[in-house]
Structure formats: structure tokens, C-alpha cells
Amino acid sequence: APFAAEWDREHTFPAQALKELGELGALGMCVPEEWGGAGMDYMSLVLTLEEIAAGDGATSTIVSVQNSLPCGIINKYGTDAQKEEWLKPLARGEKLGCFCLTEPHTGSDASAITTRADRDGDSFVLNGVKHYITTGKYAQMAIVFAVTDKTAGKKGISCFLVPTETPG
């Protein structure tokens, strides 16, 4: 990555590099081809991340997050409609996703999160604060964890796919 030091120094987001990595299939490596991914295994992902990290640790982190969190979660748990809307463009690198778990007073302890999701008709209203969100400023969708049933403990935590242009 000939520009890595400059990007770090100037706090530049590697948008063009990510676009090119997406075109190469590196942003959806373990996603099946039918959903826009490369259909590879996790060893291939690890080796790719290692090579990218040799040139730029920040870019490798973004590639890791995109593959493992938004793509991985939607691939495993998403409906076909969610995969069509989100997984395909995420895997092709046309969109970026971010992962919203960490909170100011609970850290990354998922069982202690306080962000709530309250039902409002057919929708949910999310209330809470998240931080340390890799690619959050540049993402088009967020994977957000929130408590939907406080009495159920860990089983009362749900995961939401939220377009980042959603007001609030």
C-alpha cells in the first residue's frame, strides 16, 4: 500500500482502495457467489487479511470487519430479502456496513448493553448510545444490537439492520 503512511498521517479513509478490493471480491470473501460474494473459505480470508495488513493495518481492519461482521451476520442469520437488499451490495463492495455493539459504560460486553429497541407498531425505535464503530462514518448500513426483552437476559438482545440514513 504505497499510500498507507500518507493515509494514516492525513486521516484519509481508503475509499478508492476499498472500491478496488470490492471489485476483486475481497469484501465478501466467505459469502456464497449466489449472494454476490467470492464463495471462499475462512483460510482464504485470513491469508488475504494478512497480505493486506502487511501493507496497511487500517485497510485490513476494514476488510476484516466488512467480511466478518455485516457480511458474516447477514449471511448466517439474514432472510433472503435482507440478503438481496444488503448482503449482495456489501459483498461486492458497493456498500459498507458497520457493527454497533460497544457502549460507553458497558464496553463490548454484549450481555450488559443498555441500548433499547421498543416496538412501535410494525417497527422498532432504538434508543441508546454506541461508540468505537469501525467505518461508521462511511457505512450505508449498521448492524445494531439492542435489548428487546430485559427480562430474558442475554436472550432478550436482538440484532437490527439499520440504514445509516435513518433519522435519529
Describe the function of each predicted region.
Residues 21, 25, 32, 48, ...:
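Buried hydrophobic positions in well-ordered alpha/beta secondary-structure cores of metabolic enzymes
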Residues 112-114, 167-168:
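Flexible, small-/acidic-enriched active-site or ligand-binding loops
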